Amino acid sequence: QNNLEYYKDKRFITIGFENHPMIKNYDWIEISYKQADKSFSIASLNGVLAYDREYNKCLKKKKKINKEFKSLFTIKPETYSGKHPVDKSGKSNFENTEFYLNDGIVVTTCIDWSKKMEKKYFDHLKVFISTNEFWNWINSNPY
């Protein structure tokens, strides 16, 4: 278990679990909750798969996962790509697909970090399920 400190604002805490015997489909699981919440209600649950320099394989797996979500939800997702905001050089890329639900969001994303950023991060696919409150916080909270 690792306490992950991605963001400057500490309103939410994210804990990561790697190589846990209960984790079958992902390399890493992240659970986020509001720091002040004594009941530890989950605000976000994420599954992460490492894709070391295999961005096309990541996109292929993401497409397969999105197909499963499309069979569950009646809403049309939004897909977009761009430069990752953490990498100020503009050499890291991502592709997101977002399913907006009434009380939350489901996002699948592939991130292809630049060689420099790979010293700190790893290329990966993330399946992100969160409350609207957490999603709004994460998008307004600088790294």
Segments from the language model and where they lie:
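Short amphipathic beta-strand and strand-loop transition segments with alternating hydrophobic
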Residues: 18, 27-35, 81-86, 110-112
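Non-cytosolic coordination micro-motifs
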Residues: 1-3, 7-11, 44-143
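N-terminal low-complexity, intrinsically disordered segments
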Residues: 22-52
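N-terminal Sec/ER secretory leader and immediately downstream segment
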Residues: 1-31
